[in-house]
Amino acid sequence: MQSHETNAMAVAQFLEGHPKVNKVLYPGLASHPHHDLAKKQMDNFSGMLSFQIDKGAELAQKMMSELEIIHYAVSLGHHRSLICWMGTDDLMASSYGLSGDALAAYRDFAGDGVYRLSVGLEDPDDLCEDLAQVLG
């Protein structure tokens, strides 16, 4: 797990500094809304992060075909890095128990959707380069 967590921090910091990335959610980043709580509750911060960009759905198609190291797959936890796009409209279509206010709050938070990235054991510099070549 330590390698997952170290790699995830490096990738989260890379994404947070990328001009096309609007938001990165990783509890290890000081910018995370619950970073202080996470520091109290966790020894480390996991290998899972989310990020948001404009036109995320369009980029999802490009990621499926152009990522070379990170695999486009819907799964959690693996020795390989995995990424998937979670579109807000798709999520809302299956969120029957949420009120209108809750759905509006989620859309405000997520925009048109977020990427979920499960960071694996690959070299974090290679992962950042892989993301950079797709993000442009």
Regions found by a protein language model. Give the residues of each.
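Conserved small-domain helix->loop->beta segment predominantly found in fold-type I
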Residues: 9-82, 101-109
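Ligand-binding pocket scaffold of soluble enzyme catalytic domains
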Residues: 1, 17-18, 113
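PLP-dependent enzyme catalytic core of the Aspartate aminotransferase-like
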Residues: 65, 81-136
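Short amphipathic alpha-helical segments with heptad-repeat character
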Residues: 1-5, 9, 118
